[in-house]
Structure formats: C-alpha cells, structure tokens
Amino acid sequence: MKKLLSILLSVIMAMSVIIIPTSVSAKKAKTVPNTYVATYDDILNFSKGTITTDFWGPFAYYKNSGNKYITLDKYDTPYGYEGILGYYVRGDKVYYCIKKEIFNDYLYQIKTVDLNGKNKKVLYKVKESKISNVLLLGGYGSGAIFYEKTYNKKVNKFCYTVKLFRNNKLTTLFKVYSDNLTNINVFNGKIYYQNEAYNLANGKKTTFTAKEIYVTKNYMYYINKNNNLKSLDKKDVRRIVTKNVYKYYNSNNGSSVIYSKLNSKKEEVFYKRTGTDKEYKLCAISDIYKATNTSYTGKKHYWINDALFYNNKVYFNISLDGSYYIVNVKTRGSKPSVFFKTTNKDYYIDMYMFGNKLEYRECDPNSYIIDD
C-alpha cells in the first residue's frame, strides 16, 4: 500500500494536473434549463423575475422585475469578505453558496430558499479553517454541485474536490490537483474542466479540449485549440460560430453571440452572429475611439468590461485611456455612438440587464459610493 501511494505521489508531482475520480452515485437526472449559475455580483434574469446580489445590496428576488423585492438571505459586506458565491434557480427554489463570519472564522454554507424567502435549508456547511474556498458550480436534477479548495503541501498544489449533494447524500465525484483551476463549468449534465468532460449520469470522463468556456442558460460557448469559437446546445449539437476568434464577450442566453477578431493591422473588430445567420461586423475599436473623440494609436489602452444586447443594439461598457463610456452600435453594424460617459474620471460604470431593461450606474472605487 505504501509503495502504491509513493508511486501515485510521484505521478502527481510530475504532472501539472491530476484528475482522481473517487466515487460516483449520481443516477441519471433531468437537468433543468434554468440552472444557470450567476457569480457573486451577477444578476440573474429568468421567467419569474430577477435575482440580484452585490457588495452594496441584498441577496434579493424581484418578482416580475418590479421595484419591490424579497430578501432571500442576509449577510454583512465588509469589502467582500462575506457574500454569495454562486447561485441558481430551479423551479421555485434558489440554490446558493453563502459565506459568513463566525467566531474569528468563516462559514461556507450550501443552502436553498423558496422564492418567497421562506423555507431556508442548509444542505452542507464547512468552516474556512478547514478549507480555502467553496464555490457552487451548478445543478444536476435536485442536486447541487460545488467544489472545496484546499492546499496540499505534499504535492505543492491546490486540490479541488468536486462534490454533489443530492437526495440528502453527499458524494465526492472527483478531485483535481492544479496550481489554479479557474475554468470549471456545469452544462447539460456534464462537468467541464481542464480539457475533460465528466458525465454525471455514469461517472465517465471524455476528452474535451477547450482554452476557454462560457456557459449561458441554453448554450455553452468555447474556444478550441485552433482559436475557433464553437457552441454546444442541450442536444449535444456542436457548431462553429466563427474561426480565428480573438475574444468572446457575451450571449443573450440564446444563439446570438458577441465576439471579436483581429484584422491585418492587429486591430480588434467586433462581430455579432445569431445561429446559422450571417456574421455581422459591428465596428472596430478605432471607430469607438473616434466616437469618443479619443486619440487611437493602435496601442492597447482600452478595456471592454461588458457587451450587452438591448433593443437591437449592442452596448459596450468600455474604458478608454482611463475614461469610462457606454457606447452602442446597431446589431447589423453602424457607426458607434456615445450613450453615457462618467461624470468623474475616477468613477467606473456598472452595466447590467435588470429584467428586460438595460441599467447602469457610476461607481466610486475609493468609497464604494454608487450614483444611480
């Protein structure tokens, strides 16, 4: 036994990533379409309303995107040390991971709550003193998938233990040893990570090569080793969206997607495509510089924070040489127009969809004050 452990340890040390399946008891389950996982500051819009959480507001449910909301859970927000670490909706329940401070330690809890704010239930909990981090990854039927991150001194790597809580039973699915595992996603009954796909129905793994993965409610987009942007739907149909992609920016949770390529001058050019429709050129980054009366030298002094579909236009939240703008362009291409510019150069813009409306606000990074 000791010899076997010694051999296993040497293999782990020799490879940057090792996948260790440990046990599987997950029977086949229907994956509900709306088990899209939002990040800690993301806004989740779905058929029954909107759920929000960020450093400045409550974890709340707005029915039909109205002004009145129901608080789902409470937490303090001292610079982000507490908060929501992933959440999703299944039926009338919200599944979420919450981090709270308790007795000089932090407690991670995987919980559920009804949309009316009642019937809170703790599925799983662990203290931070025992692990480094917990993140909710997604759902599988009535089960919640998450990982626990710990540091393994023997192999000098982080260990990500992926677990499933379902039918009042906790199952360890597999472990991943990695320096930094940042791209792990759940889509259509499979967990995608480190060029592997783990099938939750049978516990089998297959190779799935992707440099980057982006999950929406109905599609998974990924960039393969040839820099082709591809999509995968819930019938496991794959198609090439475009070749030689530079960056993926966003999707409307359907088959419409925003991305960019580099032209012969190494200038970023933005595109939009819907399904098998033709590819539309939106504009180039130099066009956005012209619209904002900012000098463009060809050197990268800009950053696209987000790109959203709204009313047949694409809205870019962009930083140009330290100034922040919202610039829009028609979905079939046009000259970009400035929609909004911050009143203070030190402020940045938070842009998001709330229900069916585009919302934005100025944020002061020094005092966390928001001007709506």
Give the ranges of each region predicted by the language model.
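Sec-dependent signal peptide cleavage junction
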Residues: 15-31
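Positively charged n-region of N-terminal signal peptides that target proteins for export
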Residues: 1-7
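Acidic, low-complexity, intrinsically disordered interaction modules
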Residues: 87, 137-138, 143, 258-259, ...
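Residue position within the beta-strands of beta-propeller blades
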Residues: 45, 52-53, 95-97, 144-148, ...
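Short, conserved, GDST-rich strand-edge loop motifs in beta-rich repeat architectures
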Residues: 99-104, 150-156
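Surface-exposed loop/turn elements that mediate protein-protein interactions on large endomembrane-trafficking
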Residues: 29-49, 53-79, 108-125, 155-175, ...
